UniProtKB/Swiss-Prot annotation:
Keywords from the UniProt entry: ATP synthesis, Cell inner membrane, Cell membrane, CF(0), Hydrogen ion transport, Ion transport, Membrane, Transmembrane, Transmembrane helix, Transport
Name this protein carries in UniProt: ATP synthase subunit a
Organism whose genome encodes this protein: Vibrio vulnificus (strain YJ016)
InterPro entries membership: ATP_syn_F0_a_bact/chloroplast, ATP_synth_F0_asu, ATP_synth_F0_asu_AS, F0_ATP_A_sf
Gene assigned in the entry: atpB
Gene Ontology BP terms: proton motive force-driven plasma membrane ATP synthesis
Entry's Gene Ontology molecular function annotations: proton-transporting ATP synthase activity, rotational mechanism
Compartments in which it is found: Cell inner membrane
Top-level division of the source organism's lineage: Bacteria
Alphabetical list of HAMAP family matching this protein: ATP_synth_a_bact
Subunit structure, interactors included: F-type ATPases have 2 components, CF(1) - the catalytic core - and CF(0) - the membrane proton channel. CF(1) has five subunits: alpha(3), beta(3), gamma(1), delta(1), epsilon(1). CF(0) has three main subunits: a(1), b(2) and c(9-12). The alpha and beta chains form an alternating ring which encloses part of the gamma chain. CF(1) is attached to CF(0) by a central stalk formed by the gamma and epsilon chains, while a peripheral stalk is formed by the delta and b chains.
Known role: Key component of the proton channel; it plays a direct role in the translocation of protons across the membrane.
Pfam families in the record: ATP-synt_A (PF00119)
Entry GO terms, CC: plasma membrane; proton-transporting ATP synthase complex
Major location (coarse): membrane
């Protein structure tokens, strides 16, 4: 499937499938670099996977019984226990919101990553030919805007709890007097600490984006370079391996969030 007016070449196929449905592509904004150039497909599928997460957990919570649990309830309980154990082992403060935050991040990122296993043309083809939607990327976590938005959300919480727990003065002292506790080293300390602080959301968001984008490119290459009846030969082995990537990236994002929240709750004199 190629963009309108573009020859069905491997390069055109790849370019088409790496293009988001955006307000610029729909002619709603004049410039592609505009702040209001929104990736509609990424937002839709991130909301869609979020609703799936909420729907499953809400349904299980309503039907939870003290007797023999069903398979879905067992799966949900295992996930909750897994996340709770990691929070207990890693987070050393007292905040009842950290466990729900970690659970939400793990499940949401996992579901967004899981969209990478949907066959390349399964949704874009009918979207273009039946609904007239020219572009459609179904993996939200392969969009740097989504991953960086989540990372910046975690960063905002980190700053908020750092100031709340340590006080504005304590937070400032932590930046100015660490690692060298002398006033003459304040400029050097600030340089190190500010760069380290800003690197946290950048690495958090870019790590997830890089891994998922690379996985998506491999699937697209398999679809572009092979005839349709042989695509499974290239995609299946990668899909089996990619299941591990999907899980690991969701776990890493969750664990780093817990670690950052724990650092934010540490006393400034710790």
């Amino acid at each position: 499937m190629a963009a309108p007016g573009e020859a069905l070449t491997p390069s055109g196929y790849i370019t088409h499938h790496l293009t988001n449905l955006s307000t610029y592509k729909l002619g709603l904004v004049a410039e592609e670099s505009s702040f209001w150039n929104v990736h509609i497909d990424s937002l839709f599928f991130s909301w869609f996977t979020g609703l799936i997460f909420l729907g499953i957990f809400y349904a299980v919570a309503r039907k939870t019984t003290a007797g023999v649990p069903g398979k879905l309830q067992c799966a949900v309980e295992m996930i909750v226990e897994f996340v709770a154990t990691n929070v207990k082992d890693t987070f050393h403060g007292r905040n009842p919101l950290i466990a729900p935050l970690a659970l939400t991040i793990f499940c949401w990122v996992f579901l967004m990553n899981l969209m990478d296993l949907v066959p390349i043309d399964f949704l874009p083809y009918p979207a273009e030919h039946w609904l007239g939607i020219p572009y459609l990327k179904v993996v939200p976590s392969a969009d740097v805007n989504i991953t960086m938005a989540m990372a910046l959300g975690v960063f905002a919480l980190m700053i908020y709890y750092s100031i709340k727990v340590k006080g504005l003065g304590g937070f400032a002292r932590e930046l100015a007097l660490h690692p060298f506790n002398h006033w003459t080293m304040i400029p050097f300390n600030l340089l190190i600490e500010v760069v380290s602080l800003l690197a946290k959301p950048l690495s958090l968001g870019m790590r997830l984006f890089g891994n998922m984008f690379a996985g998506e490119v491999v699937f697209i290459l398999c679809a572009a370079m092979l005839p349709w009846y042989l695509q499974w030969m290239g995609s299946l082995p990668w899909a089996i391996f990619h299941i591990l990537v999907i899980l690991i990236q969701a776990f890493v994002f969750m664990m780093l969030t817990i670690v950052y929240m724990s650092m934010a709750h540490e006393d400034s004199d710790h």
